[in-house]
Amino acid sequence: MKKIKPPHYWHEAKKFLSKKDKKLAKIINQYDGHLVTRNDPFYSLCRSIIGQQISVKAADSAWLKFEKVIKKITPINLIKLSRAKLVSVGLSRQKILYLRIMAKEFFHKRLDVKNLQKMSDEDAIKHLVR
């Protein structure tokens, strides 16, 4: 994994959180807090979709099960997975649909990932949910 430049709000957010909570400030100051990337947008988007709107514990559990059934996280491996396997890891019908659509977009190279990385969060979301 490689270090990436933090978003524009990163340092301000760390200062804000440190002022609000002394215990959290101690933790923030103990670590350099750099961000890392796997440099794999497909992996990152899968992880984001699986973790949406559920607790961290549930997301981690679903993710570990997902990794186990897919073995290597690639668009073609996701496309090949049966719906039953995806349900067995705890994914909802809607998440399965989103993951499959995204996998097909990546597989057929219809998703401009380089352009996506340059977009604001809002523009990236609009592009992904079109």
Describe each model-derived feature in a short phrase.
Residues 1-119:
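N-terminal polyanion-binding entry modules of DNA glycosylases/AP lyases
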Residues 50, 119-130:
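Catalytic DNA-binding helix-loop module of base-excision-repair DNA glycosylases/AP lyases
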